[in-house]
Amino acid sequence: AFAVLVCCLRATRLPELGRYLLAGSLVLVVCHVIAACLGLHTWWAYLRSTFWSGTGLGTIWYVIQDSSGGIIPGIGWITGTLTVGGLLGLAWLLMTVPRRPRIAQVACVALLILFITNKVYSPQWILFLVPLAALARPDLRDWAVLMVGECFYSLAVWAHLGGLSLPGGSDADVVYWASVVLRLACEMWFAWGVLDDIRRPWNDVVRVGYADDPTGGVLDYAPDPAPEPVEDSSAEVAR
């Protein structure tokens, strides 16, 4: 939703944005109503675990908490503030770059911001990232970096849960902590590559030739009012 919102605002596709938000909101409400009717207790437990639970596996917050042996106070407010701040910063960047970014690029970076800053990072969430990463930056090197981090973490998390990565007589699972840091570092590497393509669209391999946004739907070849260039002070003096 974030990617569609920002890209439609930049392309001034307001009628399409309104229809998308209306349809998406209706689908979300219907799905939650059905889930609540089928199992109210399970539905409420899911909401509680999403918004009011503590830190979860796969996050840097879990590493900090597990290594220090304490509980991070106000973790929900901290992670929420970082996520909102990251998305606002991304929105500002998207409105100021020389060309409207592809919707897959925006969705991929927004998802990575959520994953990196969130207090919960379920293993299955990678299924959301894989197709977006392939569409956002089809670069073999960066894809390999991302997958190495994910594969190493997948092995480490099951070893952690089974107690197989703990040194003899120690409660400090350094191997698992390192896998979390490596995974997040690989994701930040990939996000930086996508952001570089957004900042310098002439280097985007998807836009070679006359392609614009092949998976963007109504945004493909949509009008793109470029931001006003900043006047150089030396040029102003020369005048």
What is the predicted role of each segment?
Residues 1-8, 30, 116-125:
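Transmembrane helices and adjacent periplasmic/lumenal helix-loop junctions
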Residues 5-14, 91-99, 135-138, 192-199:
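Structural signal for the C-terminal ends of transmembrane alpha-helices
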Residues 57-117, 195-239:
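Aromatic/glycine/proline-enriched transmembrane-helix motif characteristic
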Residues 27-34, 111-119, 147-160:
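Aromatic-anchored segments of alpha-helical transmembrane domains
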Residues 145-239:
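Aromatic-enriched
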Residues 35-64:
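Extracytoplasmic catalytic-loop and juxtamembrane helix elements of membrane-embedded
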Residues 2-26:
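Perimembrane helix-loop-helix junctions
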Residues 122-141:
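Hydrophobic/aromatic-rich transmembrane helices and adjacent perimembrane loops
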